[in-house]
């Protein structure tokens, strides 16, 4: 009878640690002129709405070429290269397209955007319609 290492039972989903505690905004931005413009617009939106983002337990998970190490996004989660690749694979993100995926506290995909400018206000409004968020609201 052989032994099975404990790590064989670990959840390979790098985002599972956030399940039931946070909503996640997975951001895939390629290193292109358009990608840099998209990232700057998103960074400005996140800065302007930072209190709204925090109130919704929303963490930002960059998994693309941008932002680079040392660049900052409010409430960002730092993943290693292997984890970023695994998240992109699991979510079916395309390499050369800016994409955003909203993941609920239950771990399910709630929305996807592939835009030159992401609609953060629309995503925050969508979160407010979710049953778990409604239960959190005073």
Protein language model regions, located:
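Non-catalytic interaction/Regulatory regions outside core domains
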Residues: 2-138
């Amino acid at each position: 009878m052989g032994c099975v290492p404990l790590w064989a039972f670990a959840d390979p989903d790098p985002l599972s640690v956030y399940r039931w505690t946070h909503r996640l905004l997975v951001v895939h931005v390629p290193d292109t002129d358009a990608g840099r413009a998209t990232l700057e617009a998103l960074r400005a939106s996140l800065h302007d709405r930072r209190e709204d983002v925090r109130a919704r337990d929303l963490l930002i998970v960059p998994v693309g070429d941008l932002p680079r190490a040392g660049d900052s996004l409010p409430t960002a989660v730092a993943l290693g290269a292997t984890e970023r690749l695994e998240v992109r694979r699991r979510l079916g993100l395309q390499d050369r397209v800016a994409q955003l995926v909203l993941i609920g506290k239950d771990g399910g995909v709630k929305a996807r955007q592939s835009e030159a400018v992401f609609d953060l206000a629309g995503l925050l409004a969508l979160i407010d319609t979710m049953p778990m968020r409604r239960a959190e609201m005073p």
